[in-house]
A protein has these predicted regions:
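Structural core segment of the AMP-binding/adenylate-forming
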Residues: 69, 97-168
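Flexible, non-catalytic linker and terminal segments flanking ANL/adenylate-forming cores
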Residues: 1-22
Length: 168
């Protein structure tokens, strides 16, 4: 039986069931080993179909790219994108390197985006250029005009002090 604690939206269940001592990457590696040729994801918008081997190869490439940019274990990586293949890759790539994935609502406008990035301490933001009528890159330029002159990986924004890099 679960019960609310202090009337908040936190619920604590039974603690008698042991935790699974596996990481997401180790679990996926095991699934890949057993079922690498099987379908892992189908993206109806793009028509792409990925097996577990495809998914993990792509996620490993993104993880290597993030590491080469200076993203490490414990860093917060935001993704501001609609549901797309890149979102899935980012989820697995950040888990692979031990970075913390911060999901940014694709409908956010500038004030909500600023709050989310500041509050979560996002140092790297992976973003789509736009979503529907929302110009993501324009909103980022409004929030961080320093983008116009910053060297890649060396953004220093007054409004977004933790953000160092934007990946598109």
């Amino acid at each position: 039986m679960t019960r609310p604690i202090n009337g908040l939206s936190h619920v604590k269940g039974s603690t008698t069931r042991p935790l699974i001592h596996a990481t997401i990457p180790s679990f996926i590696a095991e699934v890949r080993k057993r079922h690498g040729h099987r379908m892992a994801a189908v993206f109806s918008q793009t028509g792409e179909r990925w097996t577990y081997d495809d998914l993990m190869r792509r996620a490993d490439r993104l993880a290597a790219g993030l590491l080469s940019l200076g993203v490490y274990k414990g860093d917060r990586v935001g993704i501001w994108s609609p549901n797309r293949p890149e979102w899935v890759l980012t989820q697995f790539a950040t888990a692979r390197i031990g970075a913390i994935l911060v999901n940014i609502n694709p409908a956010y406008q500038t004030p909500e985006l600023e709050y989310a990035l500041r509050h979560a301490g996002v140092s790297t933001l992976i973003t789509a250029p736009q979503f529907r009528e929302s110009d993501y890159l324009g909103k980022l330029r409004d929030l961080a005009p320093e983008l116009a002159t910053a060297r890649p990986g060396h953004l220093h924004s007054k409004k977004l002090p933790d953000l160092r890099r934007i990946v598109q």
